[in-house]
Amino acid sequence: MKNVGFIGWRGMVGSVLMQRMVEERDFDAIRPVFFSTSQLGQAAPSFGGTTGTLQDAFDLEALKALDIIVTCQGGDYTNEIYPKLRESGWQGYWIDAASSLRMKDDAIIILDPVNQDVITDGLNNGIRTFVGGNCTVSLMLMSLGGLFANDLVDWVSVATYQAASGGGARHMRELLTQMGHLYGHVADELANPSSAILDIERKVTTLTRSGELPVDNFGVPLAGSLIPWIDKQLDNGQSREEWKGQAETNKILNTSSVIPVDGLCVRVGALRCHSQAFTIKLKKDVSIPTVEELLAAHNPWAKVVPNDREITMRELTPAAVTGTLTTPVGRLRKLNMGPEFLSAFTVGDQLLWGAAEPLRRMLRQLA
């Protein structure tokens, strides 16, 4: 059995990873060692039936004793520890949820239902750093993988509807707190059937603009609104989140020529599922039944939702998908621009295939 160290296992992504590993009995195949950046010496969790104490996540000697390190601690930790560990001569496997190492030449972005061939080649060539991808990119490829695998995609334009969980646990709390403030502000009026809805709306809008809602994390109110910008601003006018679409898609697929991917990334008031609306330029005219067949056959989690109003409203929403590994794709139809233009709408849990699940599955391969 390999010695596997876990850092950041108590955070949001780490907690989901632990839950999935327990469900899949992954701990049966490894010797886990749990680390902490702040609570060393305290009792370690009993995942996998082991007992012990939390180790120091900054102790290079303790880390060097591991065969595999899995970290969900974030980019600052990676940037501090990873170079020191490699410079010390450590040759173990590093599995990371943070974005810091994604675009490094000696790292592979992992999404095995989509790029197992790239992962296998990397392992055969001595690659030992494996990084989870951007959530929207991973979820797009899980849903639309059949089109990419069959070399049918000329380019992709996307508008995202990204959940609060993409920002982190504090962002989710802030969204719910904002919702509570708005409701409490008009609760009496809502309870009165004779109250005028426009009066209620005005009260809500006034409170939203008042500066009284908590916005420490988002910077502006999200409840009852949206934020059409995610991550840093780049010189070309893109947000960094939008830049990741093309950069990471092409690295994951190891394309020989760049597939253009661009669009707008928008934060909405969903809790943990990202949705995406796509305009896809195909390389040739492919019938909708064939498109549906290719998408459904690509991986066990891709689910084609018929382009029917009732089914779509029931199955192609964050409410339906949250907490599941299913990555449904629907609203598939040809657009007025021509027979090669395809629309699609996808939903996926940002904390599962968008974050924890690729890490879990990579660890399973290495263990």
Swiss-Prot record:
NADP(+) binds at R10, G11, M12, V13, T37, S38, Q73, S165, G166, P193, Q350. Keywords: Amino-acid biosynthesis, Diaminopimelate biosynthesis, Lysine biosynthesis, Methionine biosynthesis, NADP, Oxidoreductase, Threonine biosynthesis. CDD domains: ASADH_C_bac_like (cd23938), VcASADH1_like_N (cd02314). The active site is at C135 (acyl-thioester intermediate), H274 (proton acceptor). It catalyses: L-aspartate 4-semialdehyde + phosphate + NADP(+) = 4-phospho-L-aspartate + NADPH + H(+). Its EC number is 1.2.1.11. It is an enzyme of class 1 (oxidoreductase). Phosphate binds at R102, K244. Pfam families: Semialdhyde_dh (PF01118), Semialdhyde_dhC (PF02774). Pathway: Amino-acid biosynthesis; L-lysine biosynthesis via DAP pathway; (S)-tetrahydrodipicolinate from L-aspartate: step 2/4; Amino-acid biosynthesis; L-methionine biosynthesis via de novo pathway; L-homoserine from L-aspartate: step 2/3; Amino-acid biosynthesis; L-threonine biosynthesis; L-threonine from L-aspartate: step 2/5. GO terms for biological process: 'de novo' L-methionine biosynthetic process; diaminopimelate biosynthetic process; isoleucine biosynthetic process; lysine biosynthetic process via diaminopimelate; threonine biosynthetic process. Substrate binds at Q162, E241, R267. One of its GO terms (molecular function) is aspartate-semialdehyde dehydrogenase activity. The modification S-cysteinyl cysteine is found at C135. SUPFAM superfamilies: Glyceraldehyde-3-phosphate dehydrogenase-like, C-terminal domain, NAD(P)-binding Rossmann-fold domains. Coiled coil: none annotated. Homodimer. Belongs to the aspartate-semialdehyde dehydrogenase family. Catalyzes the NADPH-dependent formation of L-aspartate-semialdehyde (L-ASA) by the reductive dephosphorylation of L-aspartyl-4-phosphate. PANTHER family: ASPARTATE-SEMIALDEHYDE DEHYDROGENASE, DEHYDROGENASE, PUTATIVE-RELATED. This is Aspartate-semialdehyde dehydrogenase. The gene is asd.
